[in-house]
């Protein structure tokens, strides 16, 4: 790595772990490090797991998984095994291990597929299924238009009502329901969005949280009522509410602002922090800036 870039990576890493900096700015530093990649960026991200913000640590694990770099495996294993970490953080570490997809982690994932925390257990079960599917389908084309590494490949089915039926069938294996979920996302359009939004009413917390995530990716205004309703359900798992808040920020329709602003003082830290970050994303989506994680030209100026 060139000396100047290495210096900027170091500066971004320092910003990332500085609890005195605004959380949206730290998020921008994180996503810039993810985009830069490499061992030094991974090391910088890995140092953030001592933070007090579960939301930030969750995003650290997410980014490490999206980077698909084996050098992130040690820190992700450690986070998954650390029962002092919040369930949503451990879950994301397990999902990231599945995203990297190295069969080396199968034994560990099978062990934690029996974890007493249901969100962690289900995540590890999905990760095992994903890696095993990849082993059986090594040449399967990547048809994901969103460029994300997903916890399950999309189903081959293209009929929205059929996919909706699978998605909402709680007797169906979770991996198959996830495959229907990502197929609906890839198909897109209002019918698919509304089918997915129906999933916010059923299933476990992990399932509903993933629904929120994919609706955020789709950025369709038809998802706003369902996401807003989930955010407003105080009895809902904070893991779900936070994902719905981030999705509303990604959609960036004017109707999203009201819901987000109503919860910037929420009693759940992860929810109010998600609303803070989501409002920053909303500003970006409406600003015309080229890239949200524009750290090298803007973020470093604020360090």
Swiss-Prot record:
UniProt key word Mitochondrion: no
Top-rank taxon, per record: Eukaryota
Annotated GO MF terms: deoxyhypusine monooxygenase activity; iron ion binding
Bound cofactor: record note: Binds 2 Fe(2+) ions per subunit.
Stretches forming HEAT-like PBS-type repeats: 56-82, 89-115, 176-202, 207-233, 240-266
Residues involved in Fe cation 2 binding: 91-92, 209
GO terms for biological process, alphabetical: peptidyl-lysine modification to peptidyl-hypusine
Cofactor(s) recorded in Swiss-Prot or TrEMBL: Fe(2+)
SMART domains, alphabetized: EZ_HEAT
InterPro entries assigned to the protein according to its UniProt record, in alphabetical order: ARM-like, ARM-type_fold, Deoxyhypusine_hydroxylase, HEAT_type_2, PBS_lyase_HEAT
Sequence positions that bind Fe cation 1: 58, 242-243
Pfam families named in the record: HEAT_2, HEAT_PBS
EC number: 1.14.99.29
Pathway: Protein modification; eIF5A hypusination
Disordered as annotated region, ranges: 139-158
Reaction it catalyzes: [eIF5A protein]-deoxyhypusine + AH2 + O2 = [eIF5A protein]-hypusine + A + H2O
Keywords: Hypusine biosynthesis, Iron, Metal-binding, Monooxygenase, Oxidoreductase, Repeat
Entry similarity comment: Belongs to the deoxyhypusine hydroxylase family.
Stated role: Catalyzes the hydroxylation of the N(6)-(4-aminobutyl)-L-lysine intermediate produced by deoxyhypusine synthase/DHPS on a critical lysine of the eukaryotic translation initiation factor 5A/eIF-5A. This is the second step of the post-translational modification of that lysine into an unusual amino acid residue named hypusine. Hypusination is unique to mature eIF-5A factor and is essential for its function.
HAMAP family referenced in this protein's UniProt entry, alphabetically: Deoxyhypusine_hydroxylase (MF_03101)
Protein name, UniProt field: Deoxyhypusine hydroxylase
